[in-house]
Amino acid sequence: MNYYVSKCLVYLIYLTPFFLLTGPALPDISATLCGLCFIYLTIANKDWKFYKSKIVIFFFIFSFYLILNSSLSNNIIHSYENSLFYIRFIFFALAIWYALVNYPNVISKLFVILTVIFIFLVIDSLIQFYLGYNIFLIEYRAANRITSVFGQESILGSFLIRFLPIYISLLILKNNKKNIN
């Protein structure tokens, strides 16, 4: 069972960058499932070291503070909607940390996946800029803004700039691994 859950965790981590191209639903589901896989694997393997990090403890305390603060709000239900589910991002980050520590190929494969996504988005954006439509034959209608696969949402630059630090970090980790070996 642990084997299948760990494979599920790794594949969900690989698919999350692709899911981010589709909208918010699939990445949220992926983050939640990764967090659940992480919780299961750490309980099944009795691997508590990930929970003992000072920054993780700080984020758990901060999440508890947000939930406690939400209970003091005038609109409790709306407030809980916003604060209660932030904890899934802590578990998602822990799941990625768990995968990076326990599965050495994750760094190189995730680097390749992000490279493919970056190249695809840049080529699609250039096609959209010069031809007026993208690879999926969606017309370019935004006023002086290339949207690529994001359609009406003008978030291409935001997507690329937010993934750039992750991409550079993976590049550094990948090169450090080569130098160590």
Question: In which residue ranges do the predicted regions lie?
Answer:
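Small-residue-rich segments of transmembrane alpha-helices in multi-pass membrane proteins
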Residues: 60-64, 89-93, 117-122
